């Protein structure tokens, strides 16, 4: 048997809820990896990774740009991880949620690493779907469940099955392949829902809570209401739709008898499918993206983590200590004022008990940091919770 080359790649997920969804296995790897690459959406998780890493760390979202195709960014994310693997380092890549669900760079990097003879594996993480099963309280094995990305659903003209659970991801970025999210094509998804389920069927709009200050979104709408402007503006890049069964499929008595099952059986079978890749790893588009890496200059307009050590430590404690979180929620202003080492802006943001202000005080532009500029209380209070997070992956197109 041929020996594996020095260097390895492990891909892990940070889950959805800040810090608390990171598994003990992933934490152990964070502490041992030679180099960590991460793409996470909240600053508390970013701080936690940096604090616990022994080696270098790099934020993969640096490769995003509003004037750049996301696929190009994904190729570059994969390639920078692979370069360190090829250099003999033990590399850990961390992605928001489950690292294999709606994440293109992770699959690409693992496939190429294995093909080149390196050890490469993926560890599971908590996805938005896992979070949804817990928060909305339905079992996908009852009646069956179909999960699809909104744009993929439309471009392949797939029908939604009214007899099963349907989960539709990325409803806030229909038809978008850049980092500009206007959702101008959302009406096309509504048309499909109207056609397959009717105007009166109810769906649930879901966003799992991320920061300790976040509140899980579980709003119910009739399909006819999805065209209303005041409803449409509630959907963001982190939004997922749950469409419950309209009419469950009837039980087939002959099948029940042939299988020797009780007459009261109600559950259907699950189908399992594998993943196939039919595209070359390094075609013309991929080679252009790789070539651009050597001249890539990170944008100075990308906010970076900038928070006091006290704030970083407190956000970890709020994520991992339920009793402390309850104490904070009971009186956030009084709680914040008793914490030593926090800046005035951090105390103010904590007192608002909302995720948006936390993002504002924990991430700043490099130019603002260099000049000593701090966000005003007005800017902190104005922070929009709905747009505080940017979902950073989409299914391969």
Swiss-Prot record:
GO biological process entries: methylation
Pathway membership: Secondary metabolite biosynthesis
Active site (record annotation): 70, 74, 96
Keywords noted in UniProt: Methylation, Methyltransferase, S-adenosyl-L-methionine, Transferase
Keyword Disulfide bond: no
Major enzyme class: transferase
Positions of the UniProt region annotated as Clasp domain: 247-365
Post-translational modification: MroMA automethylates at Ile-391, Ile-392, Tyr-393, Ile-394 and Val-395 before being processed by the a prolyloligopeptidase which likely forms a peptidyl ester upon removal of the follower propeptide, which then undergoes macrocyclization with the N-terminus of the modified core peptide. Peptide backbone alpha-N-methylations change the physicochemical properties of amide bonds to provide structural constraints and other favorable characteristics including biological membrane permeability to peptides.
Modified residues (N-methylvaline): 395
EC number: 2.1.1.-
Entry's family note: In the N-terminal section; belongs to the precorrin methyltransferase family.
This protein's name: Methyltransferase/ribosomally synthesized type I borosin cyclic peptide precursor mroMa1
Native source species: Mycena rosella
